[in-house]
C-alpha cells in the first residue's frame, strides 16, 4: 500500500465532500462509503423523508462515471422493473429469453432499493444471487454485474421467520436513522439553497475503476493480529452466553472481518486494530433490543479489554494488596510498643511508655494517613504526661493533628500487639510509630512494579492515540475509551503517591 497516510487523507476529504448539505448524516455517509469501497451492502432503517435515498444518490459521486439505479418496491413490483424488460426482438428472432439490462440494476454500480421488504419472491431470489456472487443470469448466459454498493431501505424490520431473513442477513451494515435533532442543524436544513442532486465531489477525489479493483486486492492483505482476534472471539463467546443476544451467522462474522480490514486499509494501517471493532455495533444487531445489547457488549469490550484496561487494573490491585502486606509487616516492626503493667484484678488493663521515650512532647507518625476532623493527618503530637495518664487510667486523649492548632479529641486504643492505633469515624485504623522508625516512601519492590505498570499503560495509551485516527468511528466512542484509559492512569499515579 503506497503512501497510506495520503490515501487516508483522500478518503477523509472524499467523505467530507459527500457529507455537504446533509445534516446529522455524517456517520451514515461514512459507513456507506466504507461499504461501497469494500463491496458490501447497507440497510437503512427509519421513517420516510429523512434522506435515505439522497444518501445512496450521493455515493454515486464517489466514483468516476458510476451508474446508479434506484427503485421503490411495492407488492406489485415485477422483475422487469428491477432487472430490465425482456427483449422482444431476441425472443421473436432467435427464441432467446434475454433481458435488456441497460439502465437497470444489472449494469449499475450503486443500487438503492426502497421499501425492500415489499419485494416479491421472484425479485428476492435474483437479488440474493446478485449480492452473493455479483452475477446475473440473463437467459442462457451468466453475466458479472458491477454493483459496488447496495443500499436497501425501509421504515420497518423484516418479519421474523419470514423468507426475507436470508436477504436481511446479506446486508452487513445496518443503520437506524432518525429525523434531524439539533436545532441549529434543523434551521440550516430548512434554509439551505443547495441542490441536493449536484455533484459535490471534485474530480481529483473520485475513485477510478482501476483504483477500486486494486484496493479490493489490497484490502484482503490487511492482517488480523492475534490480540484483535482474541477480542473478537471474546465478544462472540459473550454473545453466545446471553439469552437475548441475536444470532450471528458465520457468514456475517466473515464479512464483518473484511469490513474491519477495509476500515484499517482506508485509515492508513496495515493491520486491523481494536478501534476498528467498534464497527461491529452496526453489523451484529437484528432489532431494537439487540441493537442496545450489542452496543453495551462492545462498550464493555472497548473500555475494559481492548487496551488492557481491566488487565492493568487487576495487576494494580495485586500490587496494592502486596503493598498492604508489606506495610503491615513494617508496621509490626516499627510501631511504638507500650509496656503492659501488672494488675490482673483491675477493671482496666494499664500500660506505660517504654523507658527510652523521654521527650516531653511526642510526635507519632501514622503508618497510613487518615482523615481526622476533616483533615488529612500524617502525624500527631501528644503531651507526654497526657499520654502516660491515658495509658494508666484511660479516659479522654487529645493530640495536635499534624502538630498544628489545638489538641483534638482522638479515638485511640491499644491493640493486642500492644501498639497504639488511632481510628477515624469509619473505624479505619492506623498504627502509630516514632519518627525515624517508619519506612519512608514506597518499598523498592512496589515502586518497580508500579513503574512497569505505568510504562505498560503509556504504551497502551500511545497505541490508542495512533489508532483513533479512524474516519469511520464516531467521536463519542473514542471519548469513552480515552476516559477509561485516563481512569486507569489516574489510579496508577495515585498508588505511586501512597
UniProtKB/Swiss-Prot annotation:
Subcellular localization(s) per the UniProt record: Cytoplasm
Annotated GO CC locations: cytoplasm
InterPro entries recorded: AAA+_ATPase, ATPase_RavA, ATPase_RavA_C, MoxR, P-loop_NTPase, RavA-like_AAA_lid, RavA_ATPases, RavA_LARA_dom
GO MF terms here are: ATP binding; ATP hydrolysis activity
Question: Could you tell me the superkingdom of the organism this chain comes from?
Answer: Bacteria
Supply the alphabetized keyword list: ATP-binding, Chaperone, Cytoplasm, Hydrolase, Nucleotide-binding
Q: Which residues bind ADP?
A: 23, 49-54, 196
Q: Does the keyword Nucleotide-binding apply?
A: yes
Regulation of activity: what does the record state?
ATPase activity is stimulated by ViaA.
* Pfam families with a match to the protein in the record: AAA_lid_8 (PF17868), ATPase_RavA_C (PF12592), bpMoxR (PF20030), LARA_dom (PF20265)
Q: Which reaction does it catalyse?
A: ATP + H2O = ADP + phosphate + H(+)
Q: What is its main location?
A: cytoplasm
Q: Which residues form the signal peptide?
A: none
Which Enzyme Commission numbers does its entry carry?
A: 3.6.1.-
**Mind telling me which SMART domains this protein's record contains?**
AAA
Spell out the subunit comment: Homohexamer. Interacts with ViaA.
Protein family according to the UniProt entry = Belongs to the RavA family.
HAMAP family, alphabetized: ATPase_RavA
Checking PANTHER family in the record gives: ATPASE RAVA
Q: What does this protein do?
A: Component of the RavA-ViaA chaperone complex, which may act on the membrane to optimize the function of some of the respiratory chains. RavA functions as an ATPase.
Protein name stated in the entry: Regulatory ATPase RavA
Amino acid at each position: 500500500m503506497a503512501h497510506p497516510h495520503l490515501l487516508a487523507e483522500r478518503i477523509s476529504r472524499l467523505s467530507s465532500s459527500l457529507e455537504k448539505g446533509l445534516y446529522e448524516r455524517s456517520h451514515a455517509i461514512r459507513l456507506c462509503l466504507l461499504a461501497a469501497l469494500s463491496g458490501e451492502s447497507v440497510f437503512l432503517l427509519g421513517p420516510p423523508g429523512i434522506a435515505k435515498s439522497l444518501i445512496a444518490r450521493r455515493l454515486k459521486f464517489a466514483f468516476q462515471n458510476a451508474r446508479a439505479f434506484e427503485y421503490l418496491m411495492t407488492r406489485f413490483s415485477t422483475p422487469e422493473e428491477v432487472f430490465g424488460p425482456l427483449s422482444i426482438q431476441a425472443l421473436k428472432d432467435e427464441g432467446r429469453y434475454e433481458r435488456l439490462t441497460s439502465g437497470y440494476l444489472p449494469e449499475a454500480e450503486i443500487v438503492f432499493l426502497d421499501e425492500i421488504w415489499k419485494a416479491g419472491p421472484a425479485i428476492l431470489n435474483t437479488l440474493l444471487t446478485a449480492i452473493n456472487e455479483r452475477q446475473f443470469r440473463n437467459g442462457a448466459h451468466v453475466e458479472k454485474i458491477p454493483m459496488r454498493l447496495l443500499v436497501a431501505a425501509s421504515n420497518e424490520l423484516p418479519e421474523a421467520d419470514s423468507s426475507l431473513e436470508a436477504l436481511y442477513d446479506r446486508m452487513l451494515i445496518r443503520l437506524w436513522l432518525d429525523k434531524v435533532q439539533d436545532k441549529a442543524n434543523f434551521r440550516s436544513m430548512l434554509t439551505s439553497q443547495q441542490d441536493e442532486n449536484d455533484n459535490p465531489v471534485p474530480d481529483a477525489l473520485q475513485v477510478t475503476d482501476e483504483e477500486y479493483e486494486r484496493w479490493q486486492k489490497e484490502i484482503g492483505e490487511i492482517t488480523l493480529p492475534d490480540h484483535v482476534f482474541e477480542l473478537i472471539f471474546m465478544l462472540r463467546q459473550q454473545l453466545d452466553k446471553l439469552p437475548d443476544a441475536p444470532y450471528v451467522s458465520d457468514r456475517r462474522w466473515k464479512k464483518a472481518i473484511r469490513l474491519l480490514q477495509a476500515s484499517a486499509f482506508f485509515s492508513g494501517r496495515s493491520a486491523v486494530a481494536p478501534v476498528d471493532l467498534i464497527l461491529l455495533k452496526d453489523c451484529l444487531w437484528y432489532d431494537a433490543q439487540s441493537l442496545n445489547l450489542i452496543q453495551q457488549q462492545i462498550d464493555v469490550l472497548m473500555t475494559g479489554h481492548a487496551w488492557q484496561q481491566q488487565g492493568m487494573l487487576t495487576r494494580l490491585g495485586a500490587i496494592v494488596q502486596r503493598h498492604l502486606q508489606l506495610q503491615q509487616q513494617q508496621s509490626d516492626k516499627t510501631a511504638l510498643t507500650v509496656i503492659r503493667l501488672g494488675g490482673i484484678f483491675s477493671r482496666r488493663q494499664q500500660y506505660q511508655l517504654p523507658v527510652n521515650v523521654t521527650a516531653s512532647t511526642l510526635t507519632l507518625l501514622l503508618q497510613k494517613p487518615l482523615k481526622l476532623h476533616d483533615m488529612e493527618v500524617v502525624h500527631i503530637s501528644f503531651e507526654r504526661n497526657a499520654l502516660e495518664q491515658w495509658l494508666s487510667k484511660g479516659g479522654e486523649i487529645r493530640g495536635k493533628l499534624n502538630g498544628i492548632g489545638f489538641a483534638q479529641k482522638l479515638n485511640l486504643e491499644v491493640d493486642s500487639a500492644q501498639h497504639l492505633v488511632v481510628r477515624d469515624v469509619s473505624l479505619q485504623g492506623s498504627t502509630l510509630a516514632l519518627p525515624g522508625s517508619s519506612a519512608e516512601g514506597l518499598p523498592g519492590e512496589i515502586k518497580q512494579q508500579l513503574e512497569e505498570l505505568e510504562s505498560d499503560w503509556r504504551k497502551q495509551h500511545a497505541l490508542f492515540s495512533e489508532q483513533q485516527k479512524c474516519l469511520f468511528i464516531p467521536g463519542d466512542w473514542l471519548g469513552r475509551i480515552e476516559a477509561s484509559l485516563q481512569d486507569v492512569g489516574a489510579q496508577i499515579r495515585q498508588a505511586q503517591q501512597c
